[in-house]
Amino acid sequence: MTTITITRPDDWHIHLRDGAQLKDTVRDISRYMGRAIVMPNLVPPAIDTETALTYYDRIKAQVPAGSQFEPLMVLYLTDKTSPDEIRKAKASGKIVAAKLYPAGATTNSDSGVTELKNIYPALEAMQEVGMLFLVHGEVTDSSIDIFDRERVFIENILSKIVADFPELKIVLEHITTKDAVDFVTQASDNVAATITAHHLLYNRNHMLAGGIRPHFYCLPILKRNTHQQALLAAAASGSKKFFLGTDSAPHAKDKKEAACGCAGSYTAHAAIELYAEAFESVNALDKLEAFASFNGPDFYNLPRNADTITLVKKPWNVPATYPLGDTNVVPIRAGEAIDWQVE
């Protein structure tokens, strides 16, 4: 039986939701992740320090007994985010980053940024105090094809931010294209990226060929196979610029299986197991630990986790659904096998 032991991993991008759903999402991700960067796109969003810290308390209240899981909080940037709010958030010790959602780009992003210049004072403060800048890298112009929105964002927006704020640490989140891989690789050491398990394992054929599979529908959308291969190569390259971020984003079953379904794929039930499959597919299990456990904390200037987990190559069948508050979520690989499990 094949086993691998790695330093306990972290998730550098997750959606835990709120209310009744929180106990289920926290239960799933805290099983083996030491920390997680928690997205602030709630309703209403966590646009100030106080809101983010009360959300932190709600998450901590759901952490199972015996778990050392620690949520790392994020401020939701708006056109009105002030430099003082950035300094206050940084001083809290619990808010480690602020997030750019272009208005309308993804779930609960309606309060997001409408003009880049509106957040320049906040970005200057972030650069000054050492707060990380997390980016959902898609334009929202309806005339731009949905498969091109990441590339156009990089060309027209991100390249300018990187040039204007050379000392700002930036994470381009959930990258999905070779264009993003190339940009991050060629940028300074202050630019990094997270990659999801589902973008490593799947491409748009899995979502669209032979019938529409709504549980693969996420934003940024799955791209063609050539982009998937570029992501796999980047993750397995050993580069310190790429690290684990699940972007696990639960929606109720009826919100996904609908005439106008929500964007988001749920992977918190088996995140590291799915990443192990992806790395094994390119004969790179020896690179998994750095990607999952080292590169993220190193980029955030946080200590690596001190303990370990052991993965065993032993297939198990994923349930058709998991509980999600007063409803259910259909996870990635529902009703099918995953090759790895945590011992």
From Swiss-Prot:
Protein name, per record: Dihydroorotase
Binding-site residues for substrate, renumbered to this chain: 15-17, 41, 136, 219, 251, 263
Subunit structure, as described in the record: Homodimer.
Gene: pyrC
Keywords: Hydrolase, Metal-binding, Pyrimidine biosynthesis, Zinc
GO biological process: 'de novo' pyrimidine nucleobase biosynthetic process; 'de novo' UMP biosynthetic process
Recorded superkingdom: Bacteria
Active site (catalytic residues): 247
Signal peptide (residue range): none
